[in-house]
Swiss-Prot record:
It comes from Xanthomonas oryzae pv. oryzae (strain KACC10331 / KXO85). This is Ribosomal RNA large subunit methyltransferase E. One of its GO terms (cellular component) is cytoplasm. The active site is at K162 (proton acceptor). The keyword Hydrolase does not apply. Pfam families: FtsJ.
Amino acid sequence: MPSRSKSSQRWLKEHFADPYVKKARAEGMRSRAAYKLEELLQRDRLLKPGMVVVDLGAAPGGWSQQVRKSMGDSGRVVALDILDMPALAGVEFLHGDFREQAVLSQFEAMLGDVPVDLVLSDMAPNKSGMDAVDQPRMMHLAELAMEFADAHLKPGGAFLIKLFQGVGSDDYIRELRRRYEKVTIRKPAASRKRSPEVYALGQGKRVQIK
């Protein structure tokens, strides 16, 4: 078996020493990403009892798990992913690609006439390590998530999405400002400092794009 590269060994060492990884294990959370969302939800008071929350690209389920934990037994949490995800109590999971009409039809049938209050996306591509490849892939996923929110989020609702700072991210944020009354950029404490990731939060979805 070939030995791990120095960069791989360094990543593993950092990963297992990470306080958020340790906390996730101790508290039974599926990923350290849950603590990024926990901070964002609390800071901006995004959740209220009875809300309908949609989590795009939800696997392995850390964000959906955090939303359900924060809301208790009220409201609905709907998770979508092209990857399979083990069941989570209180989370409705739709396995499929939300770009496909058949999957969207299933989603719409699940919700009926119930409006969506909050759309979340922590989606990211498998990283190649090359910005010229990774950044366009990331922006493509972000565009898909924004289109989903355009179509399914209720007026006045909120949209929270992960972005990589780089080519296209400023233009994307400008597009968010056309769609939402208030747009804020956040970098939660659980985000690694060297990571280009930030979270864009749009609140107060406009009835019409400006």
